[in-house]
């Protein structure tokens, strides 16, 4: 403020004082007084995606949109974010508007389903009111709305099957997001909206794909992720998973348009070990010679699947490689997962 006139400074201070009297302390401030604010993030459970997002995960206090075709992995990515938040002692909520949440699959991904707050609302208005109440509580760290396309306005549910309801859902989303944005920021909660894809009719040039729910979500979302299945992972004759690509089409907290590729294995979720191998090779931390993968003097295996299996059986080596990658990108270091509860359970089953 050195270049500002003293009279102007005095006038600003007086105006700020009046605003604080009227609206309360903290309603107006100088940005520099707070120091450089650190952008907190919740990991996605996928190393390459954390790197692509630029801050090590999805930003807290912001709205996130994940969209893509059917069976592309949208819910899987959202559930991994929930699991990562719970691992750090956070609370999570899931608004299941599609009435399709599989608790068995969620548990396999690492979600603590006993503590997960779940709601299966009847209407879009009800879903968004529940969302607002949970966010306003200040106790929820991650909230997932699955999905925007399933948020059906009350008028549509109460009306006849063939009735026209033009723009109802878009108006509902616009009104809800206007109310939610400030509350989400104050409560430091990550709100993830899962969305589907639709096609515009009669588009000759350009991309005909669009997302339902109007334009409001596109504006209010700080991060938008476009998720696509690009290949099938085969083992023998069977298909065991999908190769998935995520493009960060909008990012208000880091440079956008970065991409991440990873494996989503059936009944397992995102393959952490596969991701460590891929990023390790890309960053020359894991060496690839022909079909062999090695890390320093340690031979990880012949072929990618064998290297993945070695890292699964040797979590200390996997953690070491992961933390070297994280250091390179200035991301928070990963900690060793405590396996005591698993060991206790196996001991109990052996004794019984």
From Swiss-Prot:
GO terms for biological process: DNA recombination; DNA repair; SOS response. The keyword Calcium does not apply. GO terms for molecular function: ATP binding; ATP hydrolysis activity; ATP-dependent DNA damage sensor activity; damaged DNA binding; single-stranded DNA binding. Pfam families: RecA, RecA_C. Gene3D superfamilies: P-loop containing nucleotide triphosphate hydrolases. ATP binds at residues 68-75. Keywords: ATP-binding, Cytoplasm, DNA damage, DNA recombination, DNA repair, DNA-binding, Nucleotide-binding, SOS response. GO terms for cellular component: cytosol. It is found in: Cytoplasm. SMART domains: AAA. It comes from the Bacteria. InterPro entries: AAA+_ATPase (IPR003593), DNA_recomb/repair_RecA (IPR013765), DNA_recomb/repair_RecA_CS (IPR020584), P-loop_NTPase (IPR027417), RecA-like_C (IPR049261), RecA-like_N (IPR049428), RecA_ATP-bd (IPR020588), RecA_C_sf (IPR023400). Disulfide bonds: none annotated. NCBIfam families: tigrfam_recA (TIGR02012). Can catalyze the hydrolysis of ATP in the presence of single-stranded DNA, the ATP-dependent uptake of single-stranded DNA by duplex DNA, and the ATP-dependent hybridization of homologous single-stranded DNAs. It interacts with LexA causing its activation and leading to its autocatalytic cleavage. PANTHER family: MITOCHONDRIAL DNA REPAIR PROTEIN RECA HOMOLOG-RELATED, RECA. Belongs to the RecA family. This is Protein RecA. The gene is recA.
């Amino acid at each position: 403020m050195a270049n500002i006139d003293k009279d102007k400074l005095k006038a600003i201070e007086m105006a700020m004082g009046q605003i604080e009297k009227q609206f309360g302390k903290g309603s107006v401030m100088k940005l520099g007084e707070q120091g450089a604010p650190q952008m907190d993030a919740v990991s996605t459970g996928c190393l390459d995606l954390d790197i692509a997002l630029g801050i090590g995960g999805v930003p807290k206090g912001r709205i996130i949109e994940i969209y893509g075709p059917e069976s592309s992995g949208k819910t899987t990515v959202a559930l991994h974010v929930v699991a990562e938040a719970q691992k750090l002692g956070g609370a999570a909520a899931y608004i299941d508007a599609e009435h399709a949440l599989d608790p068995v699959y969620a548990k396999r991904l690492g979600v603590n389903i006993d503590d997960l707050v779940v709601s299966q609302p009847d209407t879009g208005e009800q879903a968004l009111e529940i969302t607002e109440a949970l966010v306003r509580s200040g106790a929820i760290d991650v909230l997932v709305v699955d999905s925007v396309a399933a948020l059906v306005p009350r008028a549509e549910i109460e009306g006849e099957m063939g009735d026209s309801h033009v723009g109802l859902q878009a108006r509902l989303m616009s009104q809800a997001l206007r109310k939610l944005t400030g509350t989400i920021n104050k409560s430091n909660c990550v709100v993830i909206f899962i969305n589907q894809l639709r096609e515009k009719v009669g588009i000759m040039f350009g991309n005909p794909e669009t997302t339902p729910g109007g334009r409001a979500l596109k504006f209010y979302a700080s991060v938008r992720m476009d998720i696509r299945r690009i290949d099938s992972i085969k083992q023998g004759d069977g298909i065991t998973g999908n190769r998935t690509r995520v493009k960060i089409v909008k990012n208000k907290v880091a440079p956008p348009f970065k991409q991440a590729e990873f494996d989503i294995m059936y009944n397992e979720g995102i393959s952490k070990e596969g991701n460590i191998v891929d990023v390790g090779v890309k960053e020359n931390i894991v060496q690839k010679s022909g079909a062999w993968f090695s890390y320093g003097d340690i031979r990880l295996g012949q072929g990618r699947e064998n290297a993945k299996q070695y890292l699964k059986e040797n979590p200390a080596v996997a953690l070491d490689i992961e933390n070297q990658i994280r250091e390179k990108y200035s991301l928070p270091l990963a900690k060793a997962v405590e396996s005591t509860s698993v060991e206790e359970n196996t001991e109990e089953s052996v004794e019984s």
